[in-house]
UniProtKB/Swiss-Prot annotation:
Residues 1-77, 319-352, 457-521, 697-725 are annotated as: Disordered. May play a role in terminal differentiation of skeletal muscle cells but not in the determination of cells to the myogenic lineage. Functions as a repressor of TGF-beta signaling. Its main location: nucleus. It comes from Mus musculus. Belongs to the SKI family. This is Ski oncogene. Transmembrane segments: none annotated. It holds the Pfam family Ski_Sno_DHD. Residues 471-482 have a biased composition (Acidic residues). The modification Phosphoserine is found at residues 380, 429, 477. Ubiquitinated by ARK2C, promoting proteasomal degradation, leading to enhance the BMP-Smad signaling. Residues 534-708 form a coiled coil.
Length: 725
C-alpha cells in the first residue's frame, strides 16, 4: 500500500511536468538568464537523483528469527529526464505612459517599456548634446554599439500632442536610459586621461592619497570595472567630487564615477536597467580588504557615505544572510525525511523546484565569493560547482520566488535596432494548440510562492520548518523589503500592458466544482500548516489535482478540458481588458487634445497680453524718455543761468551804476528841457496877461470914449441908459 501510494503520488503527466519545468527554468531572476539556471538545476537534479538511487540499492541486513520479516520498499518510478524548454515568449510591451527623467540636468520625456525608460532621442540631441554634430554622435553610437528603437504610433501621437515634437514629424527614435547615460558620458566626459604632467608629482600625490587612513578603496562593475579611492570628507554635497580614479587620477562625483571606465568598455554587451542615480548599489568595497581587520570598519564608513544625502531613503544597510539552517534543526528534518519514504520520494520529485529556487536565492543572497553583492555585474558563463550544490530552506524559497515573479513579470528585451514599425499579425489556432504553445503564460503568476503543502505522509514536517521560516523571515525582512517595494513599483508600471494581471482570476478556475479533485490533506496536518491564500491556494489545488485526480484517462481529459476552458476565459478577460484599455487611451488622447487646444488658446491670449504690455511699456518708456530729456534741458539752462550769474556777480554793481547814471542824466536832461519849457510857458503867460491887461485897458478906454456925456433932460437920460452896458 505504501509503495502504491508512493507510486501514485509520484506520477505526473509528462506534458504537465514539462510545462512546469519549463516555467521554472524560464522565470529565474538571474543576471545569467535562464540558460545558466537551467544548467545548474539539471546538474544538481541529476546528482541528487544519483545519490538517492545509490542509497536505495544498499543491501538490507539479514533479519534474525525474532525480528519480523522486512517490508520490501521498491524504488519509485523516476520521472523522465528533463526536456530542454523552448523559447519563452512574452507579448511586447507597448506602454504609452509618458513620464519625465533628468539627464545631465535636462528634463527629458520618456516612456517606461518593460521596466526600462526609453528617452526621446530628438529631445536629447537638442538639449544635452546640442554642441555636438550628428557625425560625432553617430560615430560614438557605432563605437559603443548603441541602437535606437522607433516609437509606436500612439507614443508618437502623445509626443506631438504634448508639444515635444512638431506635428509634421514622421517618426521618433527612442533610446534607453542606460544607452543615453553611456552616450552622454562618452561625448561630454570622454577623453579618458588628463594632460601629461610630471610623473614624480602625480605618483607622490596618488601615493599620499592611498596611504591616507581617510581614503577607502572602492570599485564598480558598470560598463567595465574601474577602481578608485573614496575620500569621505570630500563628500560634502550630492555632486561633490570625492572619488579619484586610479587610472587617470581624476576626481569624480559618485554618480559620474559609476559611468567612468578605461579598460573593458563592454561595447558588445546588452546593457539594461542602469541608472546613475542608483550609484549606492554600484559602488562596492575593494576586494583587497577581504579577510582584513579594517574590512568591517571601512564597510561601515562606506555605508555612512551612501546614507548621506539619500533624501529618498532608498539605501538600506544590508543584513548578512544565513546560508544554512541551524545545526539543531537540520537533524530533525533529516530524521523526519528518513522516517517517511513517501515524503522523501516527493522531495526527490520536486528537487528541480528546490534547486532552481536555491539558484535564485544565491543570486539574491550573494553568499558565494564569486557572486559578490553587485547590482550591475556582467553575466559570466562559468558556473562553479559549489554554486550548483544548494541546500535552500523554505523561507528563502518563498521570498526569492516572490522576487522572481515580480521581476519576471516586467521583463522585456532591452534593446532593438531602429527598424520600421511592424504590423501585428493575428493567427487563429485551435484551443488545444493554444494551451500547448502558450502553457507557460497562465502559469507565470500562478506558481508564485513555490510553497508546497504537505500531505498525510509528511504531517510532521511543518512543525520543524515553521520556526526556521519565522527566524529567517525576521532576518531577511529588512534586507528584502527594499527589493519587494522596488519590484512592486516596477510591476505596477506595466501591469496594464501585461497579460499576467488576469492570471489570478484564471488560475482560480482550477478550483472550480468541475474538477472534482478532493484534497488529500489530513485534518491534523492542516491544523499545523498555515492556511494558504491567493495564488498559494491555487497552486495547492493544482498540485492536488495532479497528484490525486489524474490517474485515469477520463480525469486527464477532464483536466485538459478545464485548462482549455481556463485559457478561453483568460483570453476573453484579456480581450475585454485590452478593449477597456484602448477606450481609456482614446478618452485620454481626447482629453489631452482638448487640453492642448485650451493650452494653445491660453498661450495665444498670453501672447496678446504680452504684446499689449510691451506696447504700453514702449509708450511709457517713450514718455519717460521725453520727460527725462526735458528735465535735462531745464537743468542745463538753470546751470547756465547760474554760471552766468556767478561769473557776472563782480561787475554787476558797476554796470547797474552806469545804467542808473545814464538814466539819471537822461532824466536830468529831460528835467532841464521841462524847466525851459516851463519858463517859456511862464513867459508866454506873462505876455498874454500883459496883452490882456492892455486889451482890457484899451477896451476900457474905448468904453470911456464911447460913453456919452450925461444930459439933464429926460430924453437924454434914456439915451444914456441905452448906451450903457
Amino acid at each position: 500500500m505504501e509503495a502504491a501510494a508512493a507510486g501514485r503520488g509520484g506520477f505526473q503527466q509528462p506534458g504537465l511536468q514539462k510545462t512546469l519545468e519549463q516555467f521554472h527554468l524560464s522565470s529565474m531572476s538571474s543576471l545569467g538568464g535562464p540558460a545558466v539556471s537551467r544548467r545548474a538545476g539539471q546538474e544538481a537534479y541529476k546528482k541528487e537523483s544519483a545519490k538517492e538511487a545509490g542509497a536505495a540499492t544498499v543491501p538490507a541486513p539479514v533479519p534474525t528469527a525474532a525480528e519480523p520479516p522486512p517490508v520490501l520498499h521498491l524504488p519509485a518510478i523516476q520521472p523522465p529526464p528533463p526536456v530542454l524548454p523552448g523559447p519563452f515568449f512574452m507579448p511586447s510591451d507597448r506602454s504609452t505612459e509618458r513620464c519625465e527623467t533628468v539627464l545631465e540636468g535636462e528634463t527629458i520625456s520618456c516612456f517606461v517599456v518593460g521596466g526600462e525608460k526609453r528617452l526621446c532621442l530628438p529631445q536629447i540631441l537638442n538639449s544635452v548634446l546640442r554642441d555636438f554634430s550628428l557625425q560625432q554622435i553617430n560615430s560614438v553610437c557605432d563605437e559603443l554599439h548603441i541602437y535606437c528603437s522607433r516609437c509606436t504610433a500612439d507614443q508618437l501621437e502623445i509626443l506631438k500632442v504634448m508639444g515635444i515634437l512638431p506635428f509634421s514629424a514622421p517618426s521618433c527614435g527612442l533610446i534607453t536610459k542606460t544607452d543615453a547615460e553611456r552616450l552622454c558620458n562618452a561625448l561630454l566626459y570622454g577623453g579618458a586621461y588628463p594632460p601629461p604632467c610630471k610623473k614624480e608629482l602625480a605618483a607622490s600625490l596618488a601615493l599620499g592619497l592611498e596611504l591616507s587612513e581617510r581614503s577607502v578603496r572602492v570599485y564598480h562593475e558598470c560598463f567595465g570595472k574601474c577602481k578608485g579611492l573614496l575620500v569621505p570628507e570630500l563628500y560634502s554635497s550630492p555632486s561633490a567630487a570625492c572619488i579619484q580614479c586610479l587610472d587617470c587620477r581624476l576626481m569624480y562625483p559618485p554618480h559620474k564615477f559609476v559611468v567612468h571606465s578605461h579598460k573593458a568598455l563592454e561595447n558588445r554587451t546588452c546593457h539594461w536597467g542602469f541608472d546613475s542615480a542608483n550609484w549606492r548599489a554600484y559602488i562596492l568595497l575593494s576586494q583587497d580588504y577581504t579577510g582584513k581587520e579594517e574590512q568591517a570598519r571601512l564597510g561601515r564608513c562606506l555605508d555612512d557615505v551612501k546614507e548621506k544625502f539619500d533624501y529618498a531613503n532608498k539605501y538600506k544597510r544590508r543584513v548578512p544572510r544565513v546560508s544554512e539552517p541551524p545545526a539543531s534543526i537540520r537533524p530533525k528534518t533529516d530524521d523526519t525525511s528518513s522516517q517517511s519514504p513517501a515524503s522523501s520520494e516527493k522531495d526527490k520529485q520536486s528537487t528541480w523546484l528546490r534547486t532552481l529556487a536555491g539558484s535564485s536565492n544565491k543570486s539574491l543572497g550573494c553568499t558565494h565569493p564569486r557572486q559578490r553583492l553587485s547590482a550591475f555585474r556582467p553575466w559570466s558563463p562559468a558556473v562553479s560547482a559549489s554554486e550548483k550544490e544548494t541546500s535552500p530552506h523554505l523561507p528563502a524559497l518563498i521570498r526569492d520566488s516572490f522576487y522572481s515573479y515580480k521581476s519576471f513579470e516586467t521583463a522585456v528585451a532591452p534593446n532593438v535596432a531602429l527598424a520600421p514599425p511592424t504590423q501585428q499579425k493575428v493567427v487563429n489556432s485551435p484551443p488545444c494548440t493554444t494551451v500547448v504553445s502558450r502553457a507557460p503564460e497562465p502559469l507565470t503568476t500562478c506558481i508564485q510562492p513555490r510553497k508546497r503543502k504537505l500531505t498525510l505522509d509528511t504531517a510532521g514536517a511543518p512543525d520543524m520548518l515553521t520556526p526556521v521560516a519565522a527566524a529567517e523571515e525576521d532576518k531577511d525582512s529588512e534586507a528584502e523589503v527594499e527589493v519587494e517595494s522596488r519590484e512592486e513599483f516596477t510591476s505596477s508600471l506595466s501591469s496594464l500592458s501585461s497579460p499576467s494581471f488576469t492570471s489570478s482570476s484564471s488560475a482560480k478556475d482550477l478550483s472550480s466544482p468541475g474538477m472534482h479533485a478532493p484534497p488529500v490533506v489530513a485534518p491534523d496536518a492542516a491544523a499545523h500548516v498555515d492556511a494558504p491564500s491567493g495564488l498559494e491556494a491555487e497552486l495547492e489545488h493544482l498540485r492536488q489535482a495532479l497528484e490525486g485526480g489524474l490517474d485515469t484517462k477520463e480525469a486527464k481529459e477532464k483536466f485538459l478540458h478545464e485548462v482549455v476552458k481556463m485559457r478561453v476565459k483568460q483570453e476573453e478577460k484579456l480581450t475585454a481588458a485590452l478593449q477597456a484599455k484602448r477606450t481609456l487611451h482614446q478618452e485620454l488622447e481626447f482629453l489631452r487634445v482638448a487640453k492642448k487646444e485650451k493650452l494653445r488658446e491660453a498661450t495665444e491670449a498670453k501672447r496678446n497680453l504680452r504684446k499689449e504690455i510691451e506696447r504700453l511699456r514702449a509708450e511709457n518708456e517713450k514718455k519717460m524718455k521725453e520727460a527725462n530729456e526735458s528735465r535735462v534741458r531745464l537743468k542745463r539752462e538753470l546751470e547756465q543761468a547760474r554760471q552766468v550769474r556767478v561769473c557776472d556777480k563782480g561787475c554787476e554793481a558797476g554796470r547797474l551804476r552806469a545804467k542808473y547814471s545814464a538814466q539819471v542824466e537822461d532824466l536830468q536832461a529831460k528835467l532841464q528841457h521841462a524847466e525851459a519849457d516851463r519858463e517859456q510857458l511862464r513867459a508866454d503867460l506873462l505876455r498874454e496877461r500883459e496883452a490882456r491887461e492892455h486889451l482890457e485897458k484899451v477896451v476900457r478906454e474905448l468904453q470911456e470914449q464911447l460913453r456919452p456925456r450925461p444930459r439933464p433932460e429926460h430924453p437924454g437920460g434914456e439915451s444914456n441908459a441905452e448906451l450903457g452896458p
